[in-house]
């Protein structure tokens, strides 16, 4: 008689796994571009003319932070006490043909990227905030 091996094992039914997944999906669909963690909250939103990336640097010094914009990747690097922490975001657009403005005011880093295309070529930019 042919028997499926998986039939011999009881299925694990862990409600906590489902609850965790439900919570993650709920947060993702409410705000799919908010990547929040306790150390470096980053938000991406758009207006009719711009994409805007904001990072809360409340607990950081500008000299600790480096921003890298390359292709469609946004990288925020923090160097503190001999350790490096990096946060990366793949974005739904390329930086190489966009007009970009960056400012850091009241401990909020704002990167505004115009939606309109500029005449451009391959592009990569890295800069410290200080």
UniProtKB/Swiss-Prot annotation:
InterPro entries named among the record's database cross-references: HSP20-like_chaperone
Biological process, per Gene Ontology: protein complex oligomerization; protein folding; response to heat; response to hydrogen peroxide; response to salt stress; sporulation resulting in formation of a cellular spore
GO molecular function terms attached to this record: unfolded protein binding
Keywords from the UniProt entry: Sporulation
Description of what induces expression: Induced during development under sigma-K control and negatively regulated by GerE.
Role noted for this protein: Involved in spore outer coat assembly. May be part of a cross-linked insoluble skeleton that surrounds the spore, serves as a matrix for the assembly of additional outer coat material, and confers structural stability to the final structure.
Name by which UniProt lists this protein: Spore coat protein M
Organism: Bacillus subtilis (strain 168)
Gene this protein is translated from: cotM
């Amino acid at each position: 008689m042919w028997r499926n091996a998986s039939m011999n094992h009881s299925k694990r039914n862990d409600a906590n796994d489902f609850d965790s997944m439900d919570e993650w999906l709920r947060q993702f669909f409410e705000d799919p571009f908010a990547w929040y963690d306790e150390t470096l909250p980053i938000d991406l939103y758009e207006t009719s003319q711009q994409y805007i990336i904001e990072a809360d640097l409340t607990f950081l010094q500008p000299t600790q932070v480096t921003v890298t914009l390359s292709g469609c990747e946004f990288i925020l690097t923090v160097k503190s006490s001999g350790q490096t922490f990096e946060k990366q975001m793949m974005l739904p657009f390329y930086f190489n043909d966009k007009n970009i403005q960056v400012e850091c005011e009241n401990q909020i880093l704002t990167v505004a990227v115009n939606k309109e295309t500029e005449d451009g070529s391959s592009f990569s930019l890295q800069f410290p905030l200080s």
